């Protein structure tokens, strides 16, 4: 059923299946990995836990969807990893996890296993009211900022509350490679940038803002992605996430790659990413 939804472009909770998820399976603690690479000959999970050896932990392919998955006992939150993808022609690629919830600090890009559910929320009142909120009939005052401009989240909360803002709009908090880009373009869509702390620390900021009656809006960049060795470009050796026509795939001004919106699986990736921030981190 998950495979059919994924192939149909309606798997809006793909983030619950894809990526790296610490769990206990049959009484054994470890991490479950899942990645989409339909044209790959082989996909392996590599990390310090197997000396970065792609021969050690090959993943199992689901033929209908091109998803690869594997449960690895003993792998835990904090362990760095990436995918070694053997493409056609015996080309070996090293790729970050598109659905990864944490990365090493830029300019490094290896993914890091993280448990983003490990946070206790205290904003139930806000979340209940959010379902009834109609911004077309309510006064709105939005403060736009970047987390990098603040020494601490508490200072931002205090400032926004004092000035009477109803919402805070944050420049992208997702991971990005270039320090001068202010978050554009995004390199890891499901990961809070290490520049801004841990997933739990970002969740705490959203929680505190909600508790004082302030909503959280995120800038989101689903139009383009950066070109780097571990990125989405030719992820399995073929144009998987980007526009298939090479003459149309690169943004003429910025040199970034443009998403292929005709692909249901790319739409899964982008829409589930929006749902991820709304559901997991309670953004508004």
Annotate each language-model stretch with its function.
Residues 43-45, 81:
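Short beta-strand elements bearing conserved aromatic residues within extracellular beta-rich modules
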Residues 36-43, 52, 75:
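Short proline/glycine-enriched turn/loop motifs at strand-loop junctions of beta-rich domains
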Residues 1-32, 60-144, 149-152:
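The feature marks proteins involved in alpha-glucan
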Residues 56-57:
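Short, solvent-exposed S/T- and G/P-enriched segments that are highly enriched in secreted/extracellular
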Residues 104, 124-142, 146-283:
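Substrate-binding/active-site clefts of carbohydrate-active enzymes
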């Amino acid at each position: 059923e998950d495979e059919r939804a994924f192939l149909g472009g309606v798997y809006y909770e793909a983030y619950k299946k894809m990526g790296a998820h610490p769990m206990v399976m049959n009484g054994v603690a470890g991490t479950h990995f899942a990645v989409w690479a339909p044209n790959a000959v082989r996909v392996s999970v590599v990390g310090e836990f197997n000396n970065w050896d792609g021969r050690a932990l090959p993943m199992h392919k689901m033929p209908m969807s091109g998803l690869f998955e594997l449960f690895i006992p003993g792998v835990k939150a904090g362990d760095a990893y990436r995918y070694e993808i053997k493409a056609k022609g015996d080309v070996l690629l090293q790729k970050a996890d598109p659905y990864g919830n944490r990365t090493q600090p830029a300019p490094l890009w290896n993914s890091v296993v993280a448990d983003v559910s490990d946070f206790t929320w205290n904003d139930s009142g806000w979340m209940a009211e959010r379902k009834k909120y109609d911004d077309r009939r309510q006064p709105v005052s939005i403060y736009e900022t970047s987390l990098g401009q603040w020494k601490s989240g508490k200072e931002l909360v205090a400032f926004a509350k004092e000035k009477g803002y109803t919402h805070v709009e944050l420049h992208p908090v997702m991971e990005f490679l270039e320090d001068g880009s202010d978050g554009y373009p995004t390199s890891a869509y499901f990961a809070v940038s290490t520049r801004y702390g841990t997933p739990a620390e970002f969740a705490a900021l959203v929680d505190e803002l909600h508790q004082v009656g302030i909503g959280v809006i995120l800038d989101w960049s689903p139009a383009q992605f950066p070109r780097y060795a571990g990125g989405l470009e030719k992820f399995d050796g073929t144009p998987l996430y980007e526009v298939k026509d090479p003459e149309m795939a690169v943004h003429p001004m910025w040199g970034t790659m443009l998403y292929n919106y005709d692909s249901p699986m790319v739409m899964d990736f982008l829409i589930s990413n929006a749902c991820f921030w709304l559901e997991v981190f309670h953004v508004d």
